[in-house]
Amino acid sequence: MDDQFYRKSTVTGRSYDVFKTVKILNIQQACSYMDNDVFPVDIKVSIDQRSGKKCLVFYFDREESKDVYDKWCNYELK
């Protein structure tokens, strides 16, 4: 993959491929992931498209977060 798609987080210090991440805007969902030992590779401030207000965007590694995502979809995470 081209280096232009790799980022290094100023928050976590982790390097990651942007195409191998998922964006989570739901704070409850992000907290549930972290409660289950899946931590974001990056966190950024963005603008919510609907409200126009600032929001946090949590970037998680797609593979690392797959199991907790499945549990989230099945209402198995709190």
Where on the chain are the PLM-derived regions?
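Long, continuous compositionally biased terminal/linker segments
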Residues: 48-78
